[in-house]
Structure formats: C-alpha cells, structure tokens
Amino acid sequence: MELITRQKGATQIFDFSNLSAASEYELCVKKWDNTIKEFDHKFHYCIFLKDGKGKEYPVKFQHHPAYCLYMMYIIDRATRGNDASYLSIRENKEQYIRLYQTVFGIPYNEAEKKYLTFAYRLTKEGEVSRKGRYDDYLKDIDNTITSIVGRADSIPLKLRDGGHLELLPDRIKIDENLRMFNFR
C-alpha cells in the first residue's frame, strides 16, 4: 500500500474512502493521571492511537494549538458521527478557547492569545496583518500522524478535504467530560 500511494496518480485511481472502514487503528482521548508516562502534567487530556494489537502510541504535535485543533475534530467525529464536517475556527472561537483551557489548564486570556495566533497573525500593535497559522498546524498534524502509522494508514486519521476525520466514529473513544463541547 505504501508503494501505491507514492506512485503518481495512484490516489486518483484507488478508492481510499474505504480505508476508514478497513483501518485497524482507534483514537483514544484519556484524562491524564500519573500512570500516563508518555505525557507530562501540562496535558489534562491525552490523545493515543491504538493499533489492532492493542498497542498505544502517544500523539504529540510540535504545536499545542495543533493538538487542540486535532482534538476538536476527534470530539466532533465522536459526538456527531457521520454528521461531522468541516469546523470553522472563527465560528468555534469560544469552543476552541474552552477546549484549550480544558486540555492545558490555562486561564481564559492565555487561551485566547493562542486562538488569536491560530486564527490571525498580529502586528506588535495587535492589528491583523494576515491569516493565522492554520495551515502550519494542519501540516504538523499530517506529519505527526504519518510518522506514527505510515502514509497509507494515516489517510483516515488525517483532516482531509472533507474537513473531518474519516476514521469510523465507533473507532474513536473519548473521555465523557469532552462530550460537553458542541462544535459547528
């Protein structure tokens, strides 16, 4: 499969939509406790990929906003199932800030600064100069997931063109406290 995805045009020839049903992976979001050694205490919720044999791999991105972005889509897919769709960062500003606070335990004003950097690039005077780092965070997500499971197996685990995770909703397990989020 890895060879196929490297061939020019192969992604147009093969129907990758069925990969979500065939994926052996699960996404799990757990509340941090001191038994979880892969994450430090900064993380109140931890994302793991679990393979078909039950081995868990911690999912850590280079940027914390990418971690929250990915978690938004995990929660959305787990709670809305097949109705999950693209999530507007601007429409979900308050939900994103609340999620950031929940995941990292920081005050509202700090989480809001993270959101502003995410959605906009600001000058020293606080004025919007251009769009934010959304594309950088998507690339961070793609690279991290691919490094854990490989290119072909990463397809249903990435945020694709449709704007949602293609992994089947029953393969996503989240802590019940995260079901309070209502993304749109």
Task: Describe the function of each predicted region.
Residues 56-119, 141:
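Short amphipathic alpha-helical recognition elements used for nucleic-acid or partner binding
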Residues 6-84:
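Short, Lys/Arg-enriched segments at the junction into DNA-binding effector domains
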Residues 14-42, 80, 133-184:
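DNA-binding patch around the recognition helix
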Residues 5, 11, 35, 79, ...:
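Residue-identity detector for threonine
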Residues 107-120, 127, 172-184:
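Short, Lys/Arg-enriched charge-dense amphipathic segments
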Residues 52-55, 120-128:
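Short interface patches used for recognition in eukaryotic signaling and trafficking proteins
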Residues 62-70, 125-148:
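DNA-recognition element of transcription regulators
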